[in-house]
Amino acid sequence: MSAPQQQQQSQQKQQQHVRVVEQQQVEPAEAVTSSMESESISASKELTGLTHECGVFGAIACGDWPTQMDIAHVICLGLVALQHRGQESAGIATSEGKCSKNFNVHKGMGMISTLFNDDSMKKLRGNLGIGHTRYSTAGGSGVVNCQPFEVHTTHGALALAHNGELVNNESLRREVLARGVGLSTHSDSELIAQSLCCAPEDVSELDGPNWPARIRHFMMLAPLSYSLVIMLKDKIYAVRDTYGNRPLCIGKIVPINAGHGNNLDTPADGWVVSSESCGFLSIGARYVREVEPGEIVELSRSGYRTVDIVERPDFKRMAFCIFEYVYFARGDSIFEGQMVYTVRLQCGRQLWREAPVEADIVSSVPESGTAAAHGYARESGIEFAEVLCRNRYVGRTFIQPSTRLRQLGVAKKFGALSENVAGKRLVLIDDSIVRGNTIGPIIKLLRDAGAREVHIRIASPPLQYPCYMGINIPTREELIANKLNPDQLARHVGADSLAYLSVEGLVEAVQLKHRDAGDSKSKGTGHCTACLTGEYPGGLPDELSW
């Protein structure tokens, strides 16, 4: 597809998203909340540039039910560890494993710490449950789109939480509506849930619903992008799309006195599934493995098992989002057998090889660029020192009341450590540049503190294309890399020089561990670089309007 065609279709896709938000209906009381959240979200996007859509979590107790384990608190702590994946809304749904008519559900707008108190947690009784943190990309902002999403079927209740974004949302929506099923929101999660409520024509269900077959049918219709947790009365299904675009992993809850070994032979107190493994230790769980691309995993009180694996179309390579390593994931999470922090460290090393510069100290924009800065410092032999002090009490969703205060927003978030800065030549590492709104004020802050030179190094390639697979990346016109080359951007933000890590360098850093180990598994790996290269995975249909 030519560049003009991509740009035209990108604009069409953006218009589709605008129509989705315009069509969203809310009650008057919710409208006030939605308006406030909209202002807050806009400010967040302007300050932070990129936002992930969601984090999902599920937990189930083993052994006799009712369990002595407080499942709701386990899920709540799991969601706290995933709060970086979504700060707009959150929710938890639990099941006691007996009555299939209703689940215990609590969800709403806001952060985990404000949504879940003692009263709400007491109502979330159960032996299993799922949870969700959300930042909207499709469906709009508002209470009506909070997850988990619950539907009632002739076979009982079903609750679902989703991370990602359906690339063929419109065709799936038409298919569901053609069956006479009403959709009350524009959320992908409701669409998935309603799709699962209808049995495929070629599946016999004389003995009750065949949920794995229904899930497989949905996966054949929807190539990407999703990681799902689906709760029924007494079990949870963990599902990852066939391209493995979004992360999902399994953990084992072990007894408190189990120690810190691999605990393979230790009886499980329960099982968890999560977008990331970063919260496992805090809930007494141990990382087991990832849910494989196309895999359907069933979790029950007896343990977990693979019930089906759906193959990728035409045996194409998997397409795990490479920006999970760059920006979105927490540094202590594990993807593809390696810690995210280690990959970011390697990105910094590679960045020095590609873009060296004479300097006195290496530093970072806290905190996402810190690991790469350490890698740059180690490879170059230049001392690492902190030059920015972060104000942790300025939230990501701080509403900026005027243009002047908005421009000074960085001053609210950061202070300069002048003793480390004055008279020094600095290399400042950041993970990415989106619109270029933030880095300029930071450079000015450092120069005001006495920096002699400020050289910017970005530990990822230029962002040039939107993402419609669960990441809020703006239109091509808003991305600064499409307006200015590195030299022009350096002058624009007031830096002495600016350079990015190459696409090849990023892929090298991500795949280095497997290649050095001669891991045959690496032959089957692959990463989505669509936001960097414009090469979208999966042979996407025309209706996507890329």
Curated annotation (Swiss-Prot):
Its cofactor is Mg(2+); [4Fe-4S] cluster. Binds 1 Mg(2+) ion per subunit. Binds 1 [4Fe-4S] cluster per subunit. Disruption phenotype: Reduction in viability and frequent wing defects. GO terms for biological process: 'de novo' IMP biosynthetic process; determination of adult lifespan; embryonic cleavage; oogenesis; purine nucleobase biosynthetic process; purine nucleotide biosynthetic process. Residues 1-53 form a propeptide. Residues 1-39 are annotated as: Disordered. This is Amidophosphoribosyltransferase. It comes from Drosophila melanogaster (Fruit fly). The lineage of its organism: Eukaryota, Metazoa, Ecdysozoa, Arthropoda, Hexapoda. The gene is Prat.
